[in-house]
């Protein structure tokens, strides 16, 4: 049972948000060239309980025949088609301020840093979609949902940035500074 927090995004911030126990054992699954960077970035935010790493990254895990999981992902164009049919429940994983500024009409806001407190909002049977601004946070959210037993969702590749270019109903944009 693992979660994925990608090294290329706001890695340290989301490790701190999503793994509250700094003594949690951590196994690093990263490309060999990124191992030292991963260790340094974890250490900078107090996570020093790294129990190991996979020598050749994810491929080592695959070669050993260990269990893996993945999530279904769809393009913004595929999302547009599903949205227009009214077939999916939609969750916006962005911060409340981002959601308040503009979101897809009908989306339910569950910020990533609050996902564990709001798991009951995610349906266990009906299919749903998740998105964030660009795809990084929704990938983390998806890995958490998968870890907790959800398999009935899709992640929208490119997040709201990609969705906003489609013919999908959105709320009118409100500059966040005008909401102060």
What are these regions (language model features)?
Residues 1-89, 93-180:
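Rhodanese-like catalytic fold shared by cysteine-dependent sulfurtransferases
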């Amino acid at each position: 049972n693992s979660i994925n927090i990608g090294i290329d995004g706001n890695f340290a911030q989301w490790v701190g948000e999503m793994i509250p126990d700094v003594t949690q054992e951590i196994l690093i699954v990263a490309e060999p060239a990124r191992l030292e960077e991963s260790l340094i970035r974890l250490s900078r935010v107090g996570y020093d309980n790294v129990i190991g790493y996979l020598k050749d990254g994810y491929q080592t895990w695959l070669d050993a025949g260990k269990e893996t999981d993945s999530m279904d992902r769809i393009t913004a164009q595929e999302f547009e088609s599903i949205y227009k049919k009214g077939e999916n429940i939609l969750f916006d994983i962005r911060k409340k301020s981002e959601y308040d500024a503009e979101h897809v009409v009908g989306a339910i806001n569950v910020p990533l840093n609050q996902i564990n407190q709001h798991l009951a909002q995610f349906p266990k049977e009906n299919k749903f979609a998740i998105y964030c601004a660009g795809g990084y946070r929704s990938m983390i959210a998806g890995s958490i949902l998968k870890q907790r037993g959800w398999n009935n969702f899709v992640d929208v590749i490119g997040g709201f940035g990609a969705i906003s270019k489609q013919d999908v109903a959105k709320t009118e944009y409100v500059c966040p500074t005008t909401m102060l």
